[in-house]
Amino acid sequence: MGNYYYGGQESRLERISWRMWMVEAACYIVLVLLTLVSSFASLSSTTGFPCFVGTVGESSFGGDLMGHGMTPARRDGVKIFFMSSPSTLFVVFSAVFVWLVVAVYLLLGGVRVKMCNFDSSYGASELSSAVATMTSLVTLSITAWAWQVFVLMLSYRQLTLAAVAFVGIFIAGLVFMLSFASGGKSPENYATFNSQLKTVCKDVHAVITAFKAVVLNLFCVVFGVWHLMLVMLGAVIMVLNFGVSIPKATTGALVVFIVLGLVYLMMIELVVSRYVHVLLGPHLGMIIALGIAGTSALSYAETLDEIMYASWKPVAAGILGAFSVIVLALAVLRAVRSYKFHKAAQSKFLQQVASVAQTVKNRARRERNGPRVHKRYYDAVPVDAYEDDPYRQSPRRSRHGEAEDVIYENMKY
């Protein structure tokens, strides 16, 4: 296998690189477990967290920080414009769930690499980089650690520090998404890498083709929702620290969210989709974020009705609706381009999709038509039952005077 990627050269660097990958993956898994524990601990006040993390949007702040447009009776105890409690909990625990899936992916990939390379000095670092590059592992560890800080700051209602932590999470998540999808290679080299990997180790190739696409789609869903969290935290910081009025901060947050969402979807279509073609997770994430934005605006409608124009609801619904149409159109475009790519490449993906669709169709038909009626088979009548039959023909005689057996009467029908 003397090719560009798999030269089979034994060296200490290969061995050190493989061990560093295992240590980094183990550290990430430990951080994910700690993040899981701290996230569940934030739900209870008996574990040291002062406030429930899901009620940030229901917290009251002084009116002197709320800007202008409020009546004197409304300036005391004003609630900030933020996600509702279910939406905040969804953002917190959906990220933890995706990181747990990534941990399972790394465990499975590491086991497959070890099974494929009994000699750890032979190509193990190249195979492990196919599962996840070191850049991906480092950024994953940063996001898992910073997420604990983010949840802790939300619980203490230190929204400025929470926003700073989330900016770091957002940047690290962006780097992870790009490095994890590309593996640090150009699209042409990535295709060559995968084709050679299928020959070198089919087990690792199976992991990074199917499982990696699932992991990337799940992360893109969460990352799409992170856009809304980022702009909402930015709006809160503008109101609390810089005296920006609530109408301006709310309008600016929605505009920035739409702009960032369009940039995100265009980056997916122009860059990331060249590596992983079946990629509808970003569009689903933006649709979920739009739903969260709409429900948050409705839950904050009492305050917005007083400080904004009376027609803000139709205008906001029209803007969010138009953006959702754009997102759906880009999702259809991504699906069509993915279908054309797999059809031109004659990959097994379309065959597997057709097989699954046919299986589902057959099961639905059976459920609709009811259980299958089996044919009933009856035992043949024994030969002795014809002995007393007066209409039974006597057996034929051979030329020697012996009776011939009629073999067809002894067979069961």
From Swiss-Prot:
Protein purpose: Envelope glycoprotein important for virion assembly and egress. Plays a role in the correct incorporation of gH-gL into virion membrane. Directs the glycoprotein N (gN) to the host trans-Golgi network.
**Belongs to which family?**
Belongs to the herpesviridae glycoprotein M family.
> Which compartments does it reside in?
Virion membrane; Host Golgi apparatus, Host trans-Golgi network; Host endosome membrane; Host nucleus inner membrane
Q: What is this protein called?
A: Envelope glycoprotein M
How does the record classify its membrane topology?
Answer: Multi-pass membrane protein
Under the cellular component aspect of Gene Ontology, which terms does the record hold?
host cell endosome membrane; host cell Golgi apparatus; host cell nuclear inner membrane; membrane; viral envelope; virion membrane
Q: Ranges in the Intravirion compartment?
A: 1-19, 110-133, 182-218, 273-277, 334-413
User: Which spans are transmembrane here?
Assistant: 20-40, 89-109, 134-154, 161-181, 219-239, 252-272, 278-298, 313-333
**Which residues face the membrane's Virion surface side?**
41-88, 155-160, 240-251, 299-312
Statement: the UniProt record of this protein carries the keyword Transmembrane: yes
Q: Quaternary arrangement and interactors, per the entry?
A: Interacts (via N-terminus) with gN (via N-terminus). The gM-gN heterodimer forms the gCII complex.
Tell me which Pfam families the record gives.
Herpes_glycop
Task: Give the record's keywords alphabetically.
Answer: Disulfide bond, Glycoprotein, Host endosome, Host Golgi apparatus, Host membrane, Host nucleus, Membrane, Transmembrane, Transmembrane helix, Viral envelope protein, Virion
Keyword hit for Cytoplasm: no
